[in-house]
A protein has these predicted regions:
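Soluble ligand-binding/transfer domains with enclosed cavities or grooves
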Residues: 4-190
Length: 190
């Protein structure tokens, strides 16, 4: 079982993936190959993410201990079976709720699929990125980490959609990732 910090250490390195996208509405399937390069980020980079993030009334207090908030830089290159290529790089920071104050106005309930059993050990917090996947600019989401399942789940509310991204480490060299993206419900505040 990996603790919160060890999970992120295990994520570092070069990952090659074969992805399959299922577009339910029109019944299409698309395949692609992606190489991810993941490296840990330094305290200065973590501070930079905090400074550009839209935190509203929330206050993050790491008390100079940036180790409690793991973060990494991700760069990837994807080539689809149609020959289309996409490259992107971003930095992400994971701040546990214990280090965030005045968060009631930013607490968005997770979608039903993302809800977890509260009786087990769970770390919840805010997921900050310097760049969104489907929308440009810094983005703020929520995460949960379940050590017993070695599973990180990130929920991001974009303007028009919601993405629920789940990453599970099965073994040191194998991870499973599922991303479900759907239209954002109109009753969720921005």
């Amino acid at each position: 079982m990996l603790n919160f910090q060890d999970f992120f250490t295990a994520c570092a390195g070069l990952w090659t993936t074969e992805r399959i996208y299922h577009y339910i509405q029109d019944g299409q399937i698309e395949r692609s190959y992606t190489e991810f390069r993941v490296t840990a980020i330094a305290p200065a980079q973590k501070q930079q993410i905090l400074s550009i993030s839209t935190l509203g009334e929330m206050k993050v207090d790491l008390a100079g201990n940036y180790d409690v908030a793991p973060g990494f830089a991700i760069a990837f290159d994807t080539r689809s079976e149609t020959g289309e290529t996409v490259s992107m790089s971003l930095k992400a920071l994971f701040v546990p709720d214990d280090y965030v104050s005045n968060q009631s106005s930013s607490e968005i309930p997770p979608p039903v699929a993302a809800q977890i059993d509260p009786s087990g050990e769970v770390i919840k917090g805010f997921y900050l990125r310097d760049e969104g996947y489907s929308e440009a600019g810094a983005i703020l989401g929520r995460f949960t980490y379940q050590p017993i399942r070695q599973t990180l789940e990130m929920t991001t509310y974009y303007r028009r959609s919601v993405a629920v991204d789940q990453m599970r480490l099965v073994s040191p060299n194998l991870r499973l990732r599922t991303i479900v993206t759907y239209q954002r419900p109109e009753n969720i505040a921005q």
